[in-house]
Amino acid sequence: MPEIEILPSEVKKRLDSGEKLLLVDVREPKEYAISRIEGATLIPMGTIPANLQILDTDDDVICFCHHGVRSFDVANWLRQQGVASARSMAGGIERWSLEIDPTVPRY
């Protein structure tokens, strides 16, 4: 099983290569309204158990939040539920904005 955390640069590299990834934004809708990563699916942390079927995919599941704490917990929980490909993007959308795409608003 791969490490639970993945760097934003690795996520970007995999996306740019055309690899199919399921990017899951586990933040709240009010946070999503402020900034988002194009192509990500919003599934707030509290609704993950009810949406587990969406995450039952052959694609690698990359979770992210604001700084990487909530997404780490979600990825860990998903692995316990059998989603072995679940990973957390280290540093969250904040790090994505700083290192990958400065057009993504910081908050």
Task: List each language-model region with its residue ranges.
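Rhodanese-like catalytic fold shared by cysteine-dependent sulfurtransferases
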Residues: 1-21, 29-60, 69-107
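Short, surface-exposed ligand- or partner-binding patches at beta-edge/loop junctions that are enriched
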Residues: 64-65
